[in-house]
Design a protein with these regions (language model features):
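Beta-strand elements of repeat-based all-beta scaffolds
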Residues: 1-23, 27-44, 48-158, 163-179, ...
Length: 218
């Protein structure tokens, strides 16, 4: 009987950039970079490729994924505003708040005469306070968010003020309970290091699922 040595191999170029990775099964991934060290091409273990194109400010402008097996290509394009934020991604336009710098509006072209518009507002702490989705003139979703004094989310309500989800926290600030409008309640347990040790999902009819974990003591 002989033991087979299984090894993982990493190869770097003269600029200490990873150019190839070979797993213990002998499958290799390769990585290519431009003169500014931007990752321009990745070929994974299955021969699928991912190509990136950048502008003169090293911002990603196009990403093309190609499946080796089917030859299918998926292309994503990006344009930026004067502040360096993504202004257009594929068919979606983004508008940002002057002060917060957070996205306040997303507009996606659904059909020639119909857009899907998502609107966001934020409170003085930068927490999302409202979110709505419209398709054409129809409002599909409208939610409001409430936070406690520590900016922790405590409730989500619909447009009629009905509570969709509520959240409760323990004395350490960790999420201890999540209650959904459909009756599903999730409770969370933690150890002395505040690591998640249990999660239980239950309804009025009883426990639906349970999760538990233990950790080795340091």
């Amino acid at each position: 009987k002989s033991d087979t040595i299984r090894e993982t191999k990493y190869v770097y170029d003269t600029k200490n950039r990873l150019v190839s990775y070979t797993d213990p099964e002998g499958r290799t991934e390769t990585y290519t970079y431009d003169c500014n060290s931007n990752l321009t091409k990745t070929v994974d273990k299955n021969g699928n490729t991912l190509k990136n194109t950048y502008d003169n400010k090293n911002r990603l402008t196009e990403r093309t994924a190609k499946e080796k097996k089917t030859g299918k290509e998926t292309v994503h394009t990006y344009r930026y505003n004067a502040y360096g934020d993504v202004a257009v991604q594929d068919d979606t336009q983004f508008v940002y708040g002057d002060v917060s710098g957070q996205v306040t509006k997303e507009t996606t072209k659904l059909t020639k005469n119909k857009d899907v518009v998502k609107n966001y507002t934020y409170d003085s702490n930068g927490n999302k306070s409202t979110f709505s989705v419209k398709a054409g003139e129809d409002t599909k979703l409208s939610l409001s968010y409430e936070y406690d004094g520590s900016s922790r989310l405590i409730s989500v309500k619909d447009s009629e003020g009905n509570q969709a989800v509520s959240y409760t926290y323990d004395t350490e600030g960790s999420l201890s309970e999540r209650q959904a409008a459909n009756g599903l309640k999730t409770t969370y347990g933690y150890d002395y290091q505040n690591r998640l040790t249990s999660m239980t999902n239950e309804t009025g009819k009883g426990v639906v699922s349970k999760y538990s974990s233990t950790y080795l003591k340091n």
